[in-house]
Amino acid sequence: MTDDRFVVSAPYRPTGDQPRAIAQLSAGALGGVTFQTLLGATGTGKTFTIANVIEKVGKPTLVLAHNKTLAAQLCNELREFFPDNAVEYFVSYYDYYQPEAYIPQTDTYIEKSASINDEIDMLRHSATRSLFERRDVIVVASVSCIYGLGMPEEYLRAAIPLKVGSNIDQRELLRQLVTVQYERNDIDLGRGRFRVRGDVVEIGPAYEDRIIRVEFFGDEVEAVRWLDPVTGEVVRSVNSLNIYPAKHFVTPEEQLEQACIAIEQELEARVAELEGENKLLEAQRIKQRTRYDLEMLREVGYCNGVENYSRHLAARRPGEAPSCLIDYFPQDWLLVVDESHVTIPQIRGMYNGDAQRKKVLIDHGFRLPSAADNRPLKAPEFWDKVRQAIFVSATPGDWEVELSGGGRDPETGRMAGEHVAEQIIRPTGVLDPEVFVRPVAGQVDDLLHEIHDRVARRERVLVTTLTKRMAEDLTEYFQERGVKVRYLHSEIQAIERIEILQALRQGDFDVLIGVNLLREGLDLPEVSLVAILDADKEGFLRAERSLIQTIGRAARHVRGQVIMYADRLTASMDKAISETERRRQIQRAYNAAHGLTPQPIVKRLDANSILDYLAVSRRLNQQELEAAAAAPAEVALADIPELVSQLEIQMRDAAKKLEFEKAAEYRDKIHKLRERLLGK
């Protein structure tokens, strides 16, 4: 491992109450405090604060987000802050996933089907490789990282060490590559494949888009080089390196046979149990399915649904927690939970949904009982693995604050505690938005008047309703009156959601209406007004935390305002308004003391998510493709993911035909397009 230290690179220094929060959280982590909370208002630079804490603490860090999109945004920000350190991205690699299921009511069996995103799979392998080879690692992950991943000990033990001057027979290297699930393909070399050309073996590692070339002289390794995958040019030569397995699930041959014996024993016991209950159909079904899987495992070392045998393959005890990404971290690691009030409930809920589906499959003879141990971690198992954690939220939950040695003031409702760092001051001097309460009667026409005012100033408006029907009706009403408005609903996929938000920022439309999608993680500096309809209807969507989060969507604009339409002041409204006013007073006093004039937040419109080039959102026809390839600088951001995908195909085709100049042109265009997406 390297001894590299984290080094933050930024064109500005911590200001406001960032220095105090950084000092408090760093001292706590270095002093052995297990749980801390960063209670930071929207737009106060929480990510920058956490980056500085990571630099001072110096521990490998897992940053947990509650969805792929937010994880991608965090990954981009942290890569900008840590250009010389390893900032990795680890989320579910499925573009599409239909889990195996059985519906007894209709006797319907649904086979597992999935589409794996090759780019994300590479990033996952890159994350685990970095954790083995260096300490200056930040892994930004979604909650899917608590699913089983394969044992890190076996993964590391299976790695193939190569060193210049070492003696190894070429055929032995090929055998080892096959053992760790690389495929030989002398025609099309790619990730997880290798080819042989005389005394040269070329390998496409699972964790890089470059090629490893191993040159032999007899039985001696003469040279090890990294190659450009398109031109074949040598990027650099190295003295030694490890080739990690092509899959995270690695089972040695002797362990595989032991696993098959254990599966046979469990099958025998399960068949006897089902026959004893006179469930003859289920007994025949499990016997037939499992014997077929065993034959496949012994012949090729793999079968469909092999993950359902993971308990036996990993030699775990019944009920024992599976290995996951956390087990790849060293002992002294740090957990950062972003938007903790949303992410922590996800951790608690992951196990229950999975367990219910598996139980039905097991009861009806589709899977052995041990399949239940192919699962995500239970919440207690997850927290048992955590050494130190920092919870980050504008509205942390009671549980996080209590763990951080604090609680809620019964009179004011304010969160505070010994290990709770509060961050209220924005570096830009922008105050929390003003909050107004107006009657429900005439709310739509009043809102329409406010929208016209904002549109005249080229500002944007967010409107949140209680029901999908009301959002649809309101959208139609505003459209009929000439307002450029869009409706954001729950069926919209992550990539399209990014495009809609980008279009709002660009001014393609002025008003965005939604139900529960206008809260955490929306960074929209152009929004100057947030309207909350039916604010006095108590419930999840109008609870104190939800209201504070929604208010925060207008907290990045100098003229930010929030209008709550309500006929009465609920307890949640009162607490949210009081907390917002408390923050405004602190911010106003700080600005006056430091002569600070609020400045608008400037955020590049082309700064986009890593997900934009990891998922293809639309197809381009051939004419559009040729035009886009000829002038990549003029391509619409929304079209870049597909253009990159198709240019990569043409680049590989050109390379196969040995047309390296043309392939290099494609490579350069792809590089420029990706830089545009990443805002470089």
Swiss-Prot record:
<dbReference type="InterPro" id="IPR001650">
    <property type="entry name" value="Helicase_C-like"/>
</dbReference>
<dbReference type="GO" id="GO:0003677">
    <property type="term" value="F:DNA binding"/>
</dbReference>
<keyword id="KW-0963">Cytoplasm</keyword>
<dbReference type="InterPro" id="IPR027417">
    <property type="entry name" value="P-loop_NTPase"/>
</dbReference>
<feature type="domain" description="UVR">
    <location>
        <begin position="641"/>
        <end position="676"/>
    </location>
</feature>
<keyword id="KW-0227">DNA damage</keyword>
<feature type="domain" description="Helicase C-terminal">
    <location>
        <begin position="443"/>
        <end position="609"/>
    </location>
</feature>
<dbReference type="Pfam" id="PF12344">
    <property type="entry name" value="UvrB"/>
</dbReference>
<feature type="short sequence motif" description="Beta-hairpin">
    <location>
        <begin position="93"/>
        <end position="116"/>
    </location>
</feature>
<dbReference type="Pfam" id="PF00271">
    <property type="entry name" value="Helicase_C"/>
</dbReference>
<feature type="binding site">
    <location>
        <begin position="40"/>
        <end position="47"/>
    </location>
    <ligand>
        <name>ATP</name>
    </ligand>
</feature>
<dbReference type="GO" id="GO:0009381">
    <property type="term" value="F:excinuclease ABC activity"/>
</dbReference>
<dbReference type="InterPro" id="IPR024759">
    <property type="entry name" value="UvrB_YAD/RRR_dom"/>
</dbReference>
<dbReference type="Pfam" id="PF02151">
    <property type="entry name" value="UVR"/>
</dbReference>
<dbReference type="Pfam" id="PF17757">
    <property type="entry name" value="UvrB_inter"/>
</dbReference>
<comment type="similarity">
    <text>Belongs to the UvrB family.</text>
</comment>
<dbReference type="GO" id="GO:0005524">
    <property type="term" value="F:ATP binding"/>
</dbReference>
<feature type="domain" description="Helicase ATP-binding">
    <location>
        <begin position="27"/>
        <end position="422"/>
    </location>
</feature>
<keyword id="KW-0547">Nucleotide-binding</keyword>
<dbReference type="GO" id="GO:0000715">
    <property type="term" value="P:nucleotide-excision repair, DNA damage recognition"/>
</dbReference>
<dbReference type="InterPro" id="IPR006935">
    <property type="entry name" value="Helicase/UvrB_N"/>
</dbReference>
<dbReference type="InterPro" id="IPR041471">
    <property type="entry name" value="UvrB_inter"/>
</dbReference>
<dbReference type="InterPro" id="IPR036876">
    <property type="entry name" value="UVR_dom_sf"/>
</dbReference>
<dbReference type="GO" id="GO:0016887">
    <property type="term" value="F:ATP hydrolysis activity"/>
</dbReference>
<dbReference type="InterPro" id="IPR014001">
    <property type="entry name" value="Helicase_ATP-bd"/>
</dbReference>
<keyword id="KW-0228">DNA excision</keyword>
<keyword id="KW-0067">ATP-binding</keyword>
<dbReference type="InterPro" id="IPR001943">
    <property type="entry name" value="UVR_dom"/>
</dbReference>
<dbReference type="GO" id="GO:0005737">
    <property type="term" value="C:cytoplasm"/>
</dbReference>
<keyword id="KW-0234">DNA repair</keyword>
<keyword id="KW-0742">SOS response</keyword>
<dbReference type="GO" id="GO:0009380">
    <property type="term" value="C:excinuclease repair complex"/>
</dbReference>
<dbReference type="InterPro" id="IPR004807">
    <property type="entry name" value="UvrB"/>
</dbReference>
<protein>
    <recommendedName>
        <fullName>UvrABC system protein B</fullName>
    </recommendedName>
</protein>
<comment type="function">
    <text>The UvrABC repair system catalyzes the recognition and processing of DNA lesions. A damage recognition complex composed of 2 UvrA and 2 UvrB subunits scans DNA for abnormalities. Upon binding of the UvrA(2)B(2) complex to a putative damaged site, the DNA wraps around one UvrB monomer. DNA wrap is dependent on ATP binding by UvrB and probably causes local melting of the DNA helix, facilitating insertion of UvrB beta-hairpin between the DNA strands. Then UvrB probes one DNA strand for the presence of a lesion.</text>
</comment>
<keyword id="KW-0267">Excision nuclease</keyword>
<dbReference type="Pfam" id="PF04851">
    <property type="entry name" value="ResIII"/>
</dbReference>
<dbReference type="GO" id="GO:0009432">
    <property type="term" value="P:SOS response"/>
</dbReference>
<comment type="subunit">
    <text>Forms a heterotetramer with UvrA during the search for lesions. Interacts with UvrC in an incision complex.</text>
</comment>
